[in-house]
Amino acid sequence: MEEKPNYVIQVEEELPTLLRKATTEEMVGFDNYKENGHPFPHSISRFHPSHASTTTLNGQETSRSIDTMEAHHHNYNETTPWTHQRKPSISMPTSPNVLMISDPTTSLSSENHKNSGSTGKSVKFLSQPMTKVSSLYIESGNGDDDRRQSHDNHHHHLHRQHQSGHHQNQNQAANKLKDNRYNSFKTWSGKLERQFTRKPASVEPEAPNRNNQNLNTNEAMPVDRYYDALEGPELETLRPQEEIVLPNDKKWPFLLRYPISTFGMCLGVSSQAIMWKTLATAEPTKFLHVPLWINQGLWFISVALILTIATIYLLKIILFFEAVRREYYHPIRINFFFAPFISLLFLALGVPPSIITDLPHFLWYLLMFPFICLELKIYGQWMSGGQRRLSRVANPTNHLSVVGNFVGALLGASMGLREGPIFFYAVGMAHYLVLFVTLYQRLPTNETLPKDLHPVFFLFVAAPSVASMAWAKVTGSFDYGSKVCYFIAIFLYFSLAVRINFFRGIKFSLSWWAYTFPMTGAAIATIRYATVVKSTMTQIMCVVLCAIATLVVFALLVTTIIHAFVLRDLFPNDLAIAISNRPRPKQNSQHRWLDQLRNVSSENIENYLKFTDSDSSQSNDVEACNGKTQESDSS
């Protein structure tokens, strides 16, 4: 049999009129390539009518295209010498569906009808990538075909790499948007973020999160959970067996790490403004010649500090309300909600005389309104006998909820008010006495009382020192009532100050700033006492206590700067707000005795069964039965 030359077999549908016209006119550059006046066989347009074969439904095919291809190939072989053997190249369709033969007249009749009525305008068509191959053809190729095919494959490979990289970047962005680990603490859940994506989000079932199952934002966190999950004098350390609902392997958003105890800085700085104002204006300290510009500088710093901290915490309330709510139910943190309002009272007391001398009366009522709201809530819980009764939640930070009454009474009496300051003084003194006795008793239920000394104990000094000055303003003289409160404060102050190893081995936190204003309050009360009792001893006490208070505040300022800018651990993850509502399930201890009963005799097992009805733990029963068995064996 004579060997047939390489040819192209092509199954095509009937072409539209426009393409048929373009190929018959042999437009330059339109699907053809000529060199030395001879068209290459492989580059002859497969859209040419002479090459297109029509397949009928009966499977009959015209041979005009085959004859034409043979003629072109024969002429080209006579004129062009071949220097190498050509390798056949086969292009297969992308799917077997394209091999289905259909009637081209019925499928393209409407298209031909539309094209027949088109105008004669020249239209430039740009080639587009084809997603499917509509025909099966076998064509022969030479070295140019191989190079062209490898070039196309290279571009196709680069295109796929670009698409895969683009899809990978889109997936990373989508995963970042779908990160819902903090949504349980957000005021808005974050599900609306899907509306800002460029492509519509597919409805996918959310994977169950074990942490979210332990987080119920509709219920208040019971106080027992804080005691069970946290430890330490400030209940900020997570117990080893507990888990948190937020990731602990990375830093949380800044607002989640921003505690309410940050307002303690406002208490320390604003109380210093009052102390330096008293040093500059009081009679016993005239010999120091303290200028008033120190008071002015500290007062403006206090205003800027309060505005900054309050603005940041307001953002936390707006964006992460669940975190604020957990701080409010925290048995320690709830007392720091008095700190911003006490700081405002300190600003009113320490305002420089050059700015204003007489404050309006309505300002006092405005500042004391938050105290009424918080005290009705907290004092009611102390008295109700529930899980937040005072004998259960008593800790030294409760002095912050009491000292505000005395500071308010001091400010009101300084402004010329009478009944209001007496009211708050009476309420504060009643609850201070109850709190003082409860803390001194150290009941077994007071789990938050530190075993060793801690800066939190300085809050014992705050209430009596401020109460002595408030009563002196209410009565108009530093009489016996004021002196009793002052002497209590001084005794507590010295009983704590004689401990030289007070701060050794204690981790620094921002709440330490709240423990500095009691020292400042004791120094100011000493100046008031020296005004009545004039002596060299009282003047020395004024200078020493004021110097200690200033040095402590300066030391805390340096420590805060180091932790903020050098160590960068001023705001660690606030584990106190991330505990779960439900305790961690305890490991099943029913199988602890299996290891002890594997290699024992039947007598030991019978002896163990005698103890199964007792109320003691199983491990102790096993040890007891084993011990008795060993004793009987030895005897």
Swiss-Prot record:
Gene Ontology cellular-component terms listed: plasma membrane
Phosphoserine, modified sites: 189
Localisation per UniProt entry: Cell membrane
UniProt cross-references to InterPro entries, sorted A to Z: SLAC/SLAH, SLAC1/Mae1/Ssu1/TehA, Voltage-dep_anion_channel_sf
Oligomer and partners: Homotrimer. Interacts with KAT1.
Function, in words: Slow, weak voltage-dependent S-type anion efflux channel involved in maintenance of anion homeostasis. Binds to the highly selective inward-rectifying potassium channel KAT1 and inhibits its activity. Functions as an essential negative regulator of inward potassium channels in guard cells. Essential for the efficient stomatal closure and opening in guard cells.
Name of the featured protein: S-type anion channel SLAH3
